[in-house]
Amino acid sequence: MSKTISVEITINASLDEVWNEVSKIENHSNWMKDAEKIYFQTDKKSGVGTKIKVLTKIGPIKLNDFMTFTKWENKKAIGVDHVGLVTGVGEMQFHEISEKKTKFKWIETLNFPIYLGGPIGEYFGKPILEFIWKQNLNNLKEIFEK
């Protein structure tokens, strides 16, 4: 069993501006507060095949989240496979609403390991992760709307 989490936000910035920020993986910890540190596992820093390890902290729980980038469509979508303790897939989607407005959508389907409660952890974790990721999107929005 897995849980799908989907959050989105409209950002008052151009598609180019939003893409330029989000496509810099090393900057994700600036707005993803649960991502404490990002370590590249490949020489590549972007694009399909890039691998990262992310030290993730949610409340008292810390774990390394290993991801491989599987989709990289310029100004459209970035996709990942989670291949560590937490497995699943994720995608960030970019949609131009107008010249100075962009919709950013983040979708993740995750499977929790048994020591994090397995299906029970997924059930109770979903609203917590939704809350955190909505905050992350607000943090991203603030980068452009200060």
Feature-to-residue mapping (PLM):
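Hydrophobic-ligand-binding modules of eukaryotic lipid transfer/binding families
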Residues: 1-10, 101, 134, 138, ...
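Hydrophobic ligand-binding cavity/cleft-lining segments
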Residues: 1-42, 47
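Well-ordered beta-strand positions in beta-sheet-rich domains
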Residues: 6-8, 64-66, 89-91, 107
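Solvent-exposed residues in well-ordered beta-strands and their adjoining turns
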Residues: 10-14, 55-59, 70, 95-97, ...
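Structural motif
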Residues: 15, 35, 51, 76-77, ...
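Hydrophobic pocket/interface hotspot
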Residues: 18-22, 28, 52-54, 69, ...
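Glycine-rich portal/gate segments that line the openings of hydrophobic small-molecule binding cavities
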Residues: 39-86, 99, 115, 135-146
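Beta-strand/loop substructures that line and gate deep hydrophobic ligand-binding cavities in soluble
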Residues: 81-131
